[in-house]
Regions:
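Secretory targeting and sorting signals
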Residues: 1-29
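Extended beta-solenoid/beta-helix repeat architectures
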Residues: 20-124
Length: 124
């Protein structure tokens, strides 16, 4: 292999990773996201404009203030949120997420697998 081909190959190896990241939006996650993991927990918290992630079973979470997003995994969790800005994503089955304000995208990944979940707006 000649010197020209080696230089071209080296430049290609260096440029390709950079080209694949140009224009990629930054993630919306920030320090302060709240993670709740457990069974049978009852908790009231301030979302603080961050993402609330609930993972487990039988948890009952009251989220005050504004949440950027709410994500629930597991089964039989109940989340009541005052305001959700971006999205509510639910995995698993028998999950319930109520929100009072906001216009989030509602994504029910469990329903895609014929699992029953409930995501609903309720009166403030």
């Amino acid at each position: 292999m000649g010197r020209t081909k080696l230089v071209g190959l080296a430049v290609g190896v260096l440029v390709l990773p950079l080209a694949s990241t140009v224009g990629v939006p930054s993630a919306a996650a920030k320090n302060g996201d709240t993670h709740i993991t457990g069974q049978g927990l009852e908790q009231t918290l301030d979302c603080n404009n961050s993402t609330l992630l609930v993972n487990g079973t039988g948890n009952r979470i009251n989220a005050m203030g504004t949440c950027w997003a709410v994500t629930v995994q597991g089964s039989s969790n109940v989340v009541i949120a005052e305001n959700v800005i971006n999205d509510i994503t639910v995995y698993g089955w028998d999950q319930t997420v109520f929100f009072k304000n906001g216009d989030p995208a509602l994504i029910d990944r469990g329903r895609e697998l014929a699992l029953v979940n409930q995501i609903s707006r309720v009166p403030a």
